Amino acid sequence: MKAAAKRISDGVYWTGVLDWDLRNYHGYTLQGTTYNAYLVCGDEGVALIDNSYPGTFDELMARVEDALQQVGMERVDYIIQNHVEKDHSGVLVELHRRFPEAPIYCTEVAVKGLLKHYPSLREAEFMTVKTGDVLDLGGKTLTFLETPLLHWPDSMFTLLDEDGILFSNDAFGQHLCCPQRLDREIPEYILMDAARKFYANLITPLSKLVLKKFDEVKELGLLERIQMIAPSHGQIWTDPMKIIEAYTGWATGMVDERVTVIYDTMHGSTRKMAHAIAEGAMSEGVDVRVYCLHEDDRSEIVKDILESGAIALGAPTIYDEPYPSVGDLLMYLRGLKFNRTLTRKALVFGSMGGNGGATGTMKELLAEAGFDVACEEEVYYVPTGDELDACFEAGRKLAAEIRR
């Protein structure tokens, strides 16, 4: 097949893959994504940084060959593997077959992971690197920075010193698929919305590590050298401080005066309560978002929770437990550990027909997920006017607590 590489700097090319059709990736909904790979061409050698998802070798290789032709080079001399996960290593075996003399540069932890995924690479030459190690391509110098648990134990960044390009793998990424490659080539609100969703669903539990790594980058004197950030998904950041500042804000719990109301319902009673709570919150002048789990996707909901000062979570009781869709969200929130950014206020609510129990379980699980549950509203069957007034007041009080 034919596919064009995209020049992003002198001797540096995007050679990734466009996945137009992807709609769900380990529970995360999206409208396609990219698997970004980059070819760095020096006077004495060529390095390929990361690769792509299994089954996409032909597209990736077509772009690599196009870039090689543009610079008058014949082969890839070095393979850089910033991260083991298959959306960035999925064609590594084919690359090794095509360029058998090219050593694979990665962290020591990554070697173990790659061999577990791809046993046929046992005969490949691996070069393990640590923070500060360099690879000289002749006029192009790659410096490696270990970033364990950002977001896997094997992860690392690669910095192209001369151009100030940070190849950050998953960090600073977005799940977007479009012909444009640079941040400034698409509307900013689309870019930042995708970056926020990516952070909320993938980086939130790592927030303290994000801040720690930023401090390390500053101490090493690398921050002022970064002129561009090239992640492994989505757009390339030509204004790197925009996303660095956004990550700092998200990691430190900078939130809006917003209440996000999330619920599911069987016969409409919990919906009535949700709407009353939303009205109460709005009466305090804060922003309000309302999601029904029967209709809305959890990865979109989590994106709004990231910038919300409080949430209200509602479910009817079924078999003495919360409605299943709400239980699913609770387990997801417990894993995301939002309290590592900020302990957000919360209230729980719902209707029941027997002994109840859903609100108590939700309160307990939200506390485990790092939320401060300030209120609990439960009604028998259909809420009365007085009970809806109580929901309104609960929403108003919740909003008042987060007003600055």
UniProtKB/Swiss-Prot annotation:
Enzyme type, top EC level: oxidoreductase
Family label: In the N-terminal section; belongs to the zinc metallo-hydrolase group 3 family.
Coiled coil segments of this chain: none
Residues that bind FMN: 265-270, 317-320, 351-356
Full protein name: Coenzyme F420H(2) oxidase
PROSITE patterns in UniProt: FLAVODOXIN, FLAVODOXIN_LIKE
Domain annotation Flavodoxin-like: ranges: 259-399
Catalytic activity: 2 reduced coenzyme F420-(gamma-L-Glu)(n) + O2 = 2 oxidized coenzyme F420-(gamma-L-Glu)(n) + 2 H2O + 2 H(+)
Function recorded in the entry: Catalyzes the oxidation of F420H(2) with O(2). May be involved in O(2) detoxification, reducing the intracellular O(2) concentration to a level allowing growth at the expense of methane formation.
Highest taxon, organism lineage: Archaea
Listed Pfam families: Flavodoxin_1 (PF00258), ODP (PF19583)
pH-related activity note: Optimum pH is near 7.5.
Residue positions binding Fe cation 1: H83, E85, H151, D170
Keywords: Electron transport, Flavoprotein, FMN, Iron, Metal-binding, Oxidoreductase, Transport
A GO MF label: metal ion binding
Assembly and interaction partners: Homodimer. Homotetramer. The tetramer is composed of two functional dimers.
InterPro entries linked: Flavodoxin/NO_synth, Flavodoxin_CS, Flavoprotein-like_sf, Metallo-B-lactamas, ODP_dom, RibonucZ/Hydroxyglut_hydro, Rubredoxin-O_OxRdtase
Induction: By iron limitation.
Domain comment, as recorded: Contains an N-terminal beta-lactamase-like domain harboring a di-iron center, and a C-terminal flavodoxin-like domain containing FMN. Two monomers assemble via a head-to-tail arrangement, such that the beta-lactamase and the flavodoxin domains face each other, thereby forming two separated and presumably independent active sites.
Gene that this polypeptide is encoded by: fprA
List of residues binding Fe cation 2: D87, H88, D170, H233
